[in-house]
Amino acid sequence: MSNKGQTLQDPFLNTLRKEHVPVSIYLVNGIKLQGQIESFDQYVVLLRNTVTQMVYKHAISTVVPARAVSFQVEVPAE
């Protein structure tokens, strides 16, 4: 994945994780998962509800927070 993609994903997912924002995650096959983001890395997101699920990022279509969130994106120096 390009560095630019990471500069958007990481702050967004980290804000959702730190603020315990409930999210709906839609997979590319249409399945909707709900919970809170427990952790994430380059390839997976750990989603906690009654159990913790490991969701591969390549299977995720959309992440929808239950409320509006604001986050800072650091622009890398070129």
From Swiss-Prot:
SUPFAM superfamilies: Sm-like ribonucleoproteins (SSF50182). It comes from the Bacteria. The keyword Metal-binding does not apply. It holds the Pfam family Hfq. GO terms for biological process: regulation of DNA-templated transcription; regulation of RNA stability; regulation of translation, ncRNA-mediated. Keywords: RNA-binding, Stress response. GO terms for molecular function: RNA binding. Residues 10-69 form the Sm domain. InterPro entries: Hfq, LSM_dom_sf, Sm. Belongs to the Hfq family. RNA chaperone that binds small regulatory RNA (sRNAs) and mRNAs to facilitate mRNA translational regulation in response to envelope stress, environmental stress and changes in metabolite concentrations. Also binds with high specificity to tRNAs. This is RNA-binding protein Hfq. The gene is hfq.
